[in-house]
C-alpha cells in the first residue's frame, strides 16, 4: 500500500457500524492497529452508532464527521459491519474515489441503500440483495463471517436432551432479523420437532426478556444473538448495559451464542463460531 499524496504517512480508517465495545469486533481493530502500526501506518477508529440514526440527514452528518476526522484520503478503509460501508459509500463516489475498502463480518446479502437502515417497517428479506451486487463497481472486498446455526443447535440438543423449544434473542437491526430468519429455516429443515420462540427488542422490554428467561426450564434452549437498544428507547439503562451479564443469572437453561461474546467470563455457555482472534488474522492478511 502507498499513501495518497506526496509525503503523506499511509493511513487506515476503521469504521464501525456501532462501536468497538464487543470483543468479537474489538479484536479485529486491535489486530489491525498492531500489525499496520508496526509497519508505519496511522490507524484511526471511528464508531458510527448507526442504529441510533433516524433520518437521512443523520447519515450526512456522519459523513461530514468522518471527513473532519480524516481530512486527507486514507490508504485503506476497513468497515466493520456492512452498514458502515453503506453510510460511507457516497465518499467512495467522490472524496475517497477508488480507495480500497474491506467489509468485515459480511453476509451473503445486505441492504442496497442506506435509507433501509432507518425504514425498518419493510420486510427485511424482501429488501436484501446479494452483497456482490451492492459493491459492484467499487474497489471493495468483503470477508464473510460464517454462522454455524445447525451445529450450535445440535450442541444444545446434546446438552439438553429434552429440548422441545428454541428461544432466540435478537434486536431490530437487519443483520439480526436476517439471522432470525436463518435460524427459523434451519429449524424447519433439520429440527422440525423443535418450536421457535422469538425474543426481540421490537416486541418486549429488557425487563420482560429477563422475566421470560426466568420462566424457562431445560426443555427450552436459549440462543443469544444480540440485544442492542439506543437511548431513545427509554429503557432501564442499567438492564440494557448489563443484559449480557444478567441473562445467565435469570435463565435456568444455559445460554448459547452464535459469536464470541466473551464466553470465558461465564455469561454464556458457548456455541459454534469463529473466534475473534482467527477472524482478525484473516482480516489483517487480506
PLM-predicted stretches and their roles:
Residues 2-286:
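Short hydrophobic alpha-helices and adjacent helix-cap/hinge residues
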Amino acid at each position: 500500500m502507498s499513501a495518497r499524496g506526496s509525503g503523506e504517512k499511509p493511513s487506515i480508517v476503521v469504521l464501525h457500524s456501532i462501536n468497538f465495545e464487543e470483543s468479537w469486533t474489538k479484536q479485529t481493530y486491535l489486530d489491525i492497529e498492531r500489525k499496520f502500526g508496526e509497519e508505519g501506518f496511522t490507524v484511526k477508529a471511528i464508531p458510527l452508532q448507526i442504529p441510533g440514526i433516524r433520518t437521512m440527514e443523520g447519515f450526512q452528518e456522519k459523513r461530514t464527521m468522518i471527513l473532519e476526522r480524516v481530512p486527507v484520503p486514507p490508504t485503506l478503509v476497513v468497515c466493520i459491519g456492512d452498514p458502515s460501508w453503506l453510510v460511507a459509500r457516497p465518499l467512495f463516489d467522490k472524496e475517497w474515489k477508488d480507495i480500497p475498502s474491506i467489509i468485515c463480518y459480511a453476509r451473503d446479502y445486505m441492504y442496497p441503500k442506506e435509507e433501509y437502515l432507518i425504514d425498518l417497517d419493510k420486510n427485511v428479506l424482501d429488501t436484501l440483495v446479494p452483497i456482490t451486487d451492492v459493491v459492484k463497481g467499487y474497489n471493495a472486498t468483503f470477508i464473510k463471517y460464517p454462522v454455524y446455526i445447525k451445529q450450535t443447535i445440535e450442541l444444545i440438543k446434546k446438552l439438553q436432551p429434552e429440548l422441545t423449544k428454541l428461544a432466540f434473542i435478537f434486536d431490530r437491526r437487519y443483520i439480526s432479523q436476517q439471522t432470525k430468519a436463518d435460524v427459523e429455516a434451519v429449524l424447519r429443515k433439520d429440527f422440525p420437532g423443535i418450536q421457535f420462540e422469538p425474543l426481540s427488542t421490537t416486541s418486549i422490554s429488557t425487563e420482560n426478556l429477563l422475566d421470560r428467561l426466568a420462566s424457562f426450564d431445560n426443555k427450552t434452549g436459549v440462543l443469544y444473538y444480540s440485544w442492542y437498544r439506543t437511548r431513545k428507547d427509554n429503557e432501564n439503562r442499567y438492564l440494557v448495559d448489563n443484559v449480557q451479564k444478567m441473562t445467565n443469572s435469570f435463565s435456568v437453561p444455559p445460554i448459547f451464542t452464535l459469536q464470541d461474546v466473551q464466553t470465558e467470563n461465564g455469561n454464556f455457555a458457548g456455541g459454534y463460531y469463529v473466534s475473534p482472534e482467527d477472524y482478525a488474522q484473516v482480516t489483517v492478511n487480506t
